[in-house]
């Protein structure tokens, strides 16, 4: 069924796959036990062509199991079936699974009077259907409810290889299984990081909580002209490439009193990206001084660490003044190397 072109599994407002093999296995166990499974919701976009509004995780879990993409694990009641694929199950058990079905609720195309109304309806239904299940991240909600041109640009830019390497994310060219091992990927944090870069260019308007600030910016940015979107795409890619050329994969690592951490930090990312974007016209001079910049990035300990041990980049304080202070740290540092 899912191999046909009648079912669109990943409409733009859907989130990415998030279920691990244990959750997939428990779903299959429900079918074995004949436990009722909630219906899936479909939207008929054309005659007999359906978008999956709710039920992506269930449908892909069933599909993957039939295709032999995972074996059962951590079953609660049928533990003797652990480590078995569909083909290795007893014939009677396979037959029981084959007889089960998922009920579906279909919103017909004529429910909405226009494409815009249909898009809005689908997004609202998606939000309400997911409000009682697994909690969506802020970016997953944005992807569903604010999926305009700018959101699509953020998704595109999040595929930049060097951006992903600096964030220790699997590359888009890797297998789906590898991608789904990354929690940041599953929760669309990579896309939110791109959004942060553009939103923080307007730091003077920063308000708390940060999620609201990002929401408000995305609403406005979805109305940007195509020319503006093209310019922003170029700015992001050029900034990422410049930073990668100078720092490599360690660009966004957090400084500590004794060493540099092993994990990238949003506070460092925000500040480094803003400072380099602001100074992108001095790219040649910055590259000429790359070795010194790389080796002295966190040299000024008096600014980085206060007398009581607080770290400028520890992320405990994210009000406008703190964010601007962190950006200014790198801006001031770079000014010495652009002449």
PLM regions and their residue ranges:
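Basic- and aromatic-enriched surface patches that contact anionic nucleotides/nucleic acids
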Residues: 10-215, 306-309, 313
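C-terminal subdomains that position terminal phosphate/3'-OH groups for nucleotidyl transfer/ligation
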Residues: 189-196, 200-339
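N- or domain-start disorder-to-order transition segments that initiate the globular core
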Residues: 1-8
């Amino acid at each position: 069924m899912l191999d046909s072109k009648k079912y669109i599994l990943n409409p733009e407002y859907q989130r990415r796959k998030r279920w691990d093999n244990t959750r997939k296995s428990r779903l299959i166990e429900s079918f074995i036990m004949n436990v009722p499974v909630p219906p899936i919701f479909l939207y008929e976009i054309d005659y007999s062509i359906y978008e999956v509004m709710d039920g992506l995780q269930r449908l892909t879990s069933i599909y993957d199991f039939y295709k032999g993409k995972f074996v059962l694990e951590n079953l609660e009641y049928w533990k003797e079936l652990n480590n078995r694929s569909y083909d290795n199950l007893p014939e009677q058990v396979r037959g029981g699974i084959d007889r089960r079905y998922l009920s579906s609720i279909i919103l017909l195309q004529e429910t909405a009077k226009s494409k815009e109304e249909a898009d809005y309806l689908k997004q609202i239904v998606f939000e309400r259907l997911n409000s009682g299940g697994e909690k969506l991240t802020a970016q997953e909600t944005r992807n569903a409810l604010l999926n305009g041109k700018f959101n699509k640009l953020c998704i595109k830019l999040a595929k930049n290889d060097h951006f992903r390497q600096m964030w220790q994310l699997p590359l888009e060219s890797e297998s789906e299984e590898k991608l789904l091992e990354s929690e940041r990927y599953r929760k669309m944090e990579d896309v939110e990081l791109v959004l942060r870069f553009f939103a923080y260019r307007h730091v003077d308007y920063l308000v708390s909580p940060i999620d609201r600030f990002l929401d408000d910016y995305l609403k406005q940015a979805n109305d940007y002209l195509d020319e503006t979107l093209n310019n922003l795409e170029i700015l992001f890619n050029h900034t990422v490439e410049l930073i990668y050329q100078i720092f490599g994969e360690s660009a966004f690592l957090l400084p500590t009193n004794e060493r540099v951490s092993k994990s990238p930090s949003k506070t460092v990312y925000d500040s480094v990206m803003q400072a380099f974007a602001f100074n992108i016209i001095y790219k040649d001079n910055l590259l000429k001084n790359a070795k010194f910049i790389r080796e002295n990035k966190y040299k000024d300990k008096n600014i980085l660490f206060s007398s009581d041990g607080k770290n400028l980049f520890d992320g405990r304080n994210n009000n406008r003044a703190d964010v601007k202070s962190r950006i200014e740290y790198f801006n001031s540092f770079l000014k010495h190397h652009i002449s």
